Amino acid sequence: MKAAVYLGKEQLVVQDVPDPTLADGEVLLQIHACSVCGTDLRTFRHGDKKIIPPRILGHEFCATVVESRAPDANVKVGDRVVMYIVIVDGRDRYVEMGRENLTAHRTTMSYHHDGAFAPLMRVPAPAVRQGNLFKITSNISHEHMSLAEPLGCCMNAHSRLGIGLKDTVAVIGAGPIGMMHATLARLQGAQKVIVLDNNPARLEMAKRFDIDAALLVQADGSHREQVRALTEGFGSDVTIVAVSAAPAQNDALEIAAKAGRVNFFAGLPKSNPIAPLDVNHIHYKELVISGSYSEKKSDFQAAFALLHSGRFPADKFITHTLPLERINEAFPLMENGVALKVCVLPLVNGH
């Protein structure tokens, strides 16, 4: 079969690889759609020490079970599925807390096991035993269901933000993750949702969503005053940083209202993770700061249920689809703000 194989920095090559074969307890999936994640882009541009080449990438997917050597699995041949991609291989305090994303005893699809930028993907036996495959029972499209994984990551952040009816929410970053945060905030009843970005093209796409303002980040910092003007001078009750940039983290502290909640959803590059922050904002405004990394299984379940409900506007997120052979075209589309979410269709041939 053809697969998109990561060979190292700036090397994602579509090449022939053997079809996967199953051991006892494993399941084989036929991949219908796999969305390109920001981490795929980051891995392509900068590499990732956790990924040992050669590795088939892709972890945001929708598929059908085509073979099973797991008679006790919660899914069967013919079922359409999505997958919680964190596989626990031990137990510690975090697993006991239901925070599988934080345990050191885990592996992940696309990092430690071959992923879904291919027509077929093998699901390891531990993932099958742990019930990581979720059967789709609605007629929602393959492309839309591929959003379950990134949406679950956003759910993880929202689980600790407590967004309510009187809250103003500011999201810094108008990429697909930022717009998922903005959409979730509105679904949770936020009275005002403000999105900020330094890319005008992204802000134009953001205006297609149910938000109150799309603000261009300015070098002189005037966007901060715009946030205050939109919030009667108070600032944002909840601020989510959905972009990997230290200035955005500082902006979040600046625009946060007193007693506000701030979530650093996006981390900084490991090569330069230190940010100069005015921590007096945290002290004097009594801010509550949280981080967010990956997702718990409960977050994925919540995202799965939301997509199933039809209440999430998945159609606004998938702006481009590509056959597997053209996967490398996704990266400049994402970087330039032309695309919001690019979905790769491994079963579609063509150039």
Give residue ranges: language-model regions:
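Short N-terminal strand-loop motif that marks the start
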Residues: 1-61, 121-131, 347-351
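Glycine-rich beta-strand-centered segment in the early N-terminal region that forms part
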Residues: 20-34, 47-93, 101, 137
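Short glycine-centered segments of the SAM/dcSAM-binding site in methyltransferase folds
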Residues: 80, 168, 260-261, 288
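NAD(P)H dinucleotide-binding glycine-rich loop of Rossmann-like/cofactor-binding domains
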Residues: 89-172
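Mid-domain Rossmann-like dinucleotide-binding core that forms the NAD(H)/NADP(H) cofactor-binding site
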Residues: 138-219
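Glycine-rich cofactor phosphate-binding loops and adjacent beta1-alpha1 units
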Residues: 161-162, 204, 209-286, 350-351
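Residues in the short beta-alpha loop(s) of Rossmann-like NAD(P)-binding domains
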Residues: 199, 268, 295
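C-terminal hydrophobic helical "lid"/dimerization subdomain
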Residues: 250-254, 296-351
